[in-house]
């Protein structure tokens, strides 16, 4: 890892349909092998399915799902004299968002519905109602942090 200077953050353009930067980041995470148009059709298809099922604005359901999945605290390994401790630390906002997006997509890919569009819409709906594997993942991370609260004084 280079120690010179941190790479500058690239600007992410808002998506064409909703004008939302987070949707673009989500789309980029869904994308495989540079196939943006495929990722776009999956994400927009999932959001359209959500709108058809719930009769709500799909963007609010998406934002609620992401909010319910983003972790507030996580554990990081810290070596202190021969022993490795799992130290709970707060998660900064950019990492919270990245983890939330990643967990939502991983949970959606692990579902049993037929198409990725259906899987993604089902996982987003579950997450917006505080259910599903992505929310379970966040709960597990929070439990782990809670269990290791005794080591929080090793924070750096």
Swiss-Prot record:
NCBIfam families: rpsG_bact (TIGR01029). Part of the 30S ribosomal subunit. Contacts proteins S9 and S11. HAMAP family: Ribosomal_uS7_B. One of the primary rRNA binding proteins, it binds directly to 16S rRNA where it nucleates assembly of the head domain of the 30S subunit. Is located at the subunit interface close to the decoding center, probably blocks exit of the E-site tRNA. Keywords: Ribonucleoprotein, Ribosomal protein, RNA-binding, rRNA-binding, tRNA-binding. The gene is rpsG. Belongs to the universal ribosomal protein uS7 family. It comes from the Bacteria. CDD domains: uS7_Bacteria (cd14869). InterPro entries: Ribosomal_uS7, Ribosomal_uS7_bac/org-type, Ribosomal_uS7_CS, Ribosomal_uS7_dom, Ribosomal_uS7_dom_sf. One of its GO terms (molecular function) is rRNA binding. One of its GO terms (cellular component) is small ribosomal subunit. The keyword Lipoprotein does not apply. This is Small ribosomal subunit protein uS7. GO terms for biological process: translation. The keyword Chaperone does not apply. Transmembrane segments: none annotated.
């Amino acid at each position: 890892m280079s120690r010179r200077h941190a790479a500058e953050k690239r600007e992410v353009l808002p998506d064409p349909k909703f004008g939302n930067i987070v949707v673009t980041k989500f789309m980029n995470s869904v994308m495989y092998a540079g196939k943006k148009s495929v990722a776009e059709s999956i994400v927009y298809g999932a959001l359209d399915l959500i709108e058809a099922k719930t009769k709500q604005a799909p963007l609010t359901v998406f934002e609620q799902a992401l909010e319910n999945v983003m972790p507030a605290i996580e554990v990081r390994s810290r070596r202190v004299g021969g022993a490795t401790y799992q130290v709970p630390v707060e998660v900064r906002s950019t990492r919270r968002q990245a983890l939330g997006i990643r967990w939502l997509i991983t949970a959606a890919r692990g579902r049993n519905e037929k198409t990725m569009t259906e899987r993604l819409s089902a996982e987003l709906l579950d997450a917006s109602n505080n259910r599903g594997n992505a929310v379970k993942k966040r709960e597990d991370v929070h439990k782990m942090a809670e269990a290791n609260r005794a080591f929080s004084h090793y924070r750096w």
